[in-house]
């Protein structure tokens, strides 16, 4: 009888040990993953980038190379519009005087024009391109003309 009780106690001890060790592992192990991306405004002079993160999702260990495609409806459009309102990706700040076109000439601040403002300056049509007009014969080199650096300065101006 004593031997039978000893065998049963060993069996109970083994079962208890298995239950205690398995209780630390709860379910199938998973890893959490998240989509991350950077949204930038390439038209500005500075980088102006925002790092955005998607929601967390469970990634099974065998599926690390099988990341599911990001659904386009994860973020409502209102959230992105709120981000654009909070963090504008534009250099046009109302009331700052910078890039607002509130004046022209040297009296409107530092006189520094951004690249975009230089592209879109208003031109007075009455005197546009009339000062530097030359005939085609004068612009082309002739056989008798020396191509060295002799001549008038205006011949070398573009």
UniProtKB/Swiss-Prot annotation:
What modifications follow translation? O-glycosylated; contains chondroitin sulfate and heparan sulfate.
InterPro entries xrefs: Serglycin
Q: Where is this region: 9 X 2 AA tandem repeats of [SF]-G?
A: 94-111
Name the major location. cytoplasm
Cystine bridges = 40-49
Q: Which UniProt keywords apply?
A: Apoptosis, Biomineralization, Disulfide bond, Glycoprotein, Golgi apparatus, Lysosome, Proteoglycan, Repeat, Secreted, Signal
Q: Share what the entry says about its subunit structure, partners included.
A: Binds to activated CD44 and to GZMB.
Q: Which family does it belong to?
A: Belongs to the serglycin family.
Q: What is this protein called?
A: Serglycin
């Amino acid at each position: 009888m004593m031997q039978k009780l000893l065998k049963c106690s060993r069996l109970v001890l083994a079962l208890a040990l298995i239950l205690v060790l398995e209780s630390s592992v709860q379910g199938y192990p998973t890893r959490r993953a998240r989509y991350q991306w950077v949204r930038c405004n390439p038209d500005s002079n500075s980088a102006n980038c925002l790092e955005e993160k998607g929601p967390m999702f469970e990634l099974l260990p065998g599926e690390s190379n099988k990341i599911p495609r990001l659904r386009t409806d994860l973020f409502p459009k209102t959230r992105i519009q709120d981000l654009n309102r909070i963090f504008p990706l534009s250099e046009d700040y109302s009331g700052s005087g910078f890039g607002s076109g509130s004046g022209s000439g040297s009296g409107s601040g530092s006189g520094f024009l951004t690249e975009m403002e230089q592209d879109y300056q208003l031109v007075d049509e009455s005197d546009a391109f009339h000062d530097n007009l030359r005939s085609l014969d004068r612009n082309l080199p002739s056989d008798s003309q020396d191509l060295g650096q002799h001549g008038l300065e205006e011949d070398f101006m573009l």
